[in-house]
């Protein structure tokens, strides 16, 4: 066999191996990016436009409440359309989003008004994604920030532990006013 035929065969073999190598590298990169995306997908997103959703109720937690240190202030609770279905049915479907906006209060001449925003708490219902926490994902955003997250994984579990006694109400404290 002439040498140039062997060289051609070797070049074809090298190209095939490089193709396989490139394919393996591409698969590794794709697997890594899917894995990283999955980790970041566990995070609950900021609920853009939530103040245009249905306002469910307002609650004032005052100094006499044992929850005052952590949750003292004025709470406005908002629900997206799916969550409103859940309030009516007693079980919240996947895609439900509940937001509680916690504001400081201002007192002046016997009138209580809203002060600065302390945080925006968010619950997102996705049964499979958040199976460990009753199907709910939890997050809290600092003040007016849409990116400054307040919860680490342990904090999310702590949120669920607090909501656990509300299991019969699908882990939700608030109810629609009749």
Question: How would you name each of these model-derived features?
Answer:
Residues 22-31:
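Bacterial N-terminal signal peptides
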Residues 33-35:
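N-terminal signal peptide c-region/cleavage motif recognized by signal peptidases
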Residues 1-16:
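N-terminal secretory signal peptides that target proteins for export/translocation
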Residues 7, 78-79, 166-169:
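Intrinsic structural disorder/low-complexity segments
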Residues 39-68, 85, 89-178:
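Sequence context surrounding c-type heme c attachment/ligation sites in exported
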Residues 17-20, 55:
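Charged, compositionally biased non-catalytic regions
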Residues 72-83:
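Short, structured beta-strand/loop micro-motifs enriched in basic residues and often containing a Trp
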């Amino acid at each position: 066999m002439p040498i140039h035929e062997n060289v051609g065969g070797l070049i074809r073999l090298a190209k095939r191996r490089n193709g396989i190598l490139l394919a393996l590298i591409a698969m590794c990169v794709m697997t890594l990016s899917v894995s990283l995306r999955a980790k970041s997908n566990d995070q609950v997103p900021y609920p853009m436009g939530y103040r245009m959703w249905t306002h469910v109720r307002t609650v004032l937690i005052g100094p006499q409440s044992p929850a005052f240190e952590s949750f003292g202030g004025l709470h406005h609770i908002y629900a997206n359309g799916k969550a409103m279905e859940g309030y009516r049915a007693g079980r919240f479907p996947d895609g439900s989003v509940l937001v509680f906006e916690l504001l400081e209060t201002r007192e002046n001449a016997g009138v209580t008004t809203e002060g600065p925003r302390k945080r925006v708490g968010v619950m997102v219902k996705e049964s499979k994604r958040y199976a460990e926490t009753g199907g709910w994902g939890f997050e809290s955003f600092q003040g007016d920030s849409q990116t400054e997250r307040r919860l680490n994984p342990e904090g999310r579990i702590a949120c669920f532990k607090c909501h656990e006694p509300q299991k019969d109400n699908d882990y939700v404290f608030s109810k629609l006013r009749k």
